[in-house]
Amino acid sequence: MKKILSVCLAGCALCAALAGCDGGETQSGTQIELKTVEEVLEQTPAEDLVGRNDIWQFTTPFYETQIQYNEGFLLREDGQGGTLPVRLMFPAAYVLEVRSNDLKTLYEYGKDYLVEDGQLVIPEGSAIVPVPDSEFFLSDAENAEWIYNANAGEDEGRAVTTDRFVLYPYRYVVTYIRTEQYSGKTAPSKGGQLTHFSQKIADKEGITMLYVGDSIGEGAGVSGEFLNLVEMTRSGIEARSESKVELSNCSVGGIDSLEFMNLINGLYDKINPGILDNAKQKLRLMEQKKGFADIVFIALGANDSAADRSADLFKLHIGFLIDYFREANPDVSIVLASSMEISNKIRKNREDDKRDLRLHDLGEYAKVLAELEQEYTNIALADVHTVQSSVLEKKYLEDVIADNLNHPTNYMSRLYAQTLLKTIF
C-alpha cells in the first residue's frame, strides 16, 4: 500500500461533546468510529473509493465521513520558484486519488503527486501545475479594479484577478482517508425546531422551498459543471426523504438586507439601479410563492459587510424578512444562513474609493441571527460562517473563495449545502 502513511485504530465513540445544540450555537468537534486504512479499503464498495459527482458525497458533512471526498484546493506559486504547500483538513493516511476540479482528469501517484507525513506534495514535473503569479496577479495595476493584500492589508498589495475562470484550471480535488477525529466547529441537527418542514417530510408530502439570498445564492463562484449550493440543497432534501421539492430561487446578485427590505416596501429608488430589474423579477416570484412556502432560507450578509452595516441594523432587516414571510404563511419554517467569510485581503482601487471589501465582521451577523433564532419559533440558524471558520484554520482562504472576492468555490458550495442540510434534518 504505497500511499499509506499511518495506520491507527480509534475506539468507537459515536457521541460528540456538544457546546450548546440549542441557542443557535455550533457543536465543538464530532467523533465517528474510525477504522484502520485496511478496514476502510476492505469494507468500502469500490465505487465509493473514488470521488464522483454524487449528491451523497457532496452533501454529507465532511466531518461525518472517514473518506474525505473531493476536498478542493488551489495550487499557487510561492514567489520563489516553487509552489505553496497544499493544506488539507486532516493528515492524509491514504490518498485514494487526485483529480482536476471537474473530476475529468485523474493524476498519477509518484509522478504527479506524493504523500509525505500526511501531506500532499506536488513534485517537479507534475501535471498538477500552480496558477502562475502572472495570471493570479495583474500587470496593469493602475487600471485594476481590485488590489490584493496578501497580509490582509499590511502591505500595499498588488492588482489581482477576480475572474474565477482564470483560477479554476488550477483548482484540484483530493479524495483521501483520514484516521484522526475532527475538533473544529460543526453544525448540529435542528430539524426538531422546524416543526412545519419536519412534519411535511414525515408525511412524505411535497415541499415548496424558497431561497432568498444574494449572488452566492444565485450560484456565483461555481465553475458550472456541478449543482450550485441551492440546487444541491434541494437535491439533498429529496435524497434524504420521500418528498419532492419545488424550488423558487429568489436570490439577487449584489443585494443586501436593507435593499431587500426596501424592495418589499416598494422603495425602488433606494436600490442599486444595476440590480433593480432582477430584484423586481424576484420580488414577483416571492409574492407568488410566499403563501405556499413550506421552508424559506434567508441567506444574506456578504454585501452588508461590504456596506459596513451594523449588526443591529442587519438584525432589524432580517427580522423584517421573517415577518414578511410569516404574515403570508404563519406555519412556514425559516432557516437563517450566516454568510461565508469574504476576502479580507482585497480592497477597491479607485482614487475616490480605497475601501476594503470586508468592512464589518460577519461573525457579528451570525450572533444576531442566533438571537433571532431564540426570538421566533419554527426557525433555525444554519451557521455556515462559524463552521467555515474552523475550515479556514486548516485551508487557505483562496481554497474556498473562487474569485478573490466573496463567492464560493465548488468545494465551498458543498460545505454550504452540507451545513444547510445538517441543520434541517
Give residue spans per PLM region.
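Positively charged n-region of N-terminal signal peptides that target proteins for export
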Residues: 1-4
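Extended beta-strand solenoid/passenger and fiber regions
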Residues: 34-186
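Serine-esterase "nucleophile elbow" of acetyl-processing enzymes
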Residues: 180-253, 282-289
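Oxyanion-hole/transition-state-stabilizing segment in secreted/luminal serine hydrolases
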Residues: 211-212, 218-220, 225-226, 247, ...
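Catalytic His-Asp segment of secreted/periplasmic serine-dependent ester chemistry enzymes
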Residues: 339-425
